[in-house]
């Protein structure tokens, strides 16, 4: 398993790069499920709910009755498969959260046994505390699974107080996740790209400057 984070300013192409990677993953017969954080952040775990609900539509047989009881609070669509599923009672919120996190891990692991799985969560700069905690948990628990956890976030929106900040800061030294920073193209980069595209090493500086400032 692997975790990769794409970071960069708004509009730099994080989602586009991820989309191209997902196309390649599908061509390699990987399962691909996508979730997006919302600016409102009014639904806890929203991107996971979105992605796992989609996964359930394609792989209903990967959920056991026991797992359904743990996941039903997060993925209500499970009731379509297990109408009797009810969340397991718990007087300890931390233990309940840990059971939920492990249930998500188990579900992803079961899904990946058939085919490798890519879980892409976009706009993580809008992640709530619960979502950030679950993302961190999954990233730490998938090394032995055939799962790629792919995320994208706006670097300038992740301050010290952001719920994902600690994970982003500590994940690379701990070798938990590889962050790929996307930067704007320099004037030199644009020139090199134009010359390659036009197959002309003599494209003039004014032309390159015009395109650089336009884009």
Which sequence ranges carry the predicted segments?
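Key residue(s) within conserved catalytic/signature motifs
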Residues: 1-215
């Amino acid at each position: 398993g692997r975790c990769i984070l794409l970071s960069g300013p708004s509009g730099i192409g994080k989602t586009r790069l991820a989309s191209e990677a997902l196309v390649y993953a599908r061509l390699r017969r990987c399962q691909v499920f996508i979730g997006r954080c919302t600016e409102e952040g009014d639904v806890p775990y929203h991107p996971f709910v979105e992605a796992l609900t989609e996964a359930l539509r394609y792989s209903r047989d990967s959920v056991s009755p026991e797992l359904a009881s743990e996941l039903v609070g997060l993925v209500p669509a499970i009731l379509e498969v297990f109408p009797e599923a009810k969340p397991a009672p718990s007087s300890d919120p931390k233990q309940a959260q840990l059971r939920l996190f492990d249930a998500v891990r188990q579900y992803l692991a079961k899904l990946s046994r058939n085919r490798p799985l890519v879980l892409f969560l976009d706009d993580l700069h809008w992640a709530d505390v619960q979502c950030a905690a679950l993302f961190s948990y999954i990233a730490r628990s998938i090394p032995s699974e055939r799962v790629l956890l792919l995320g994208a976030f706006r670097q300038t929106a992740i301050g010290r107080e952001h719920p994902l900040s600690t994970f982003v800061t500590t994940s690379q030294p701990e070798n938990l996740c590889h962050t790929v920073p996307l930067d704007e193209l320099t004037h030199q980069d644009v020139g090199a790209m134009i010359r390659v595209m036009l197959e002309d090493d003599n494209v003039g500086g004014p032309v390159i400057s015009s395109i650089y400032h336009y884009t």
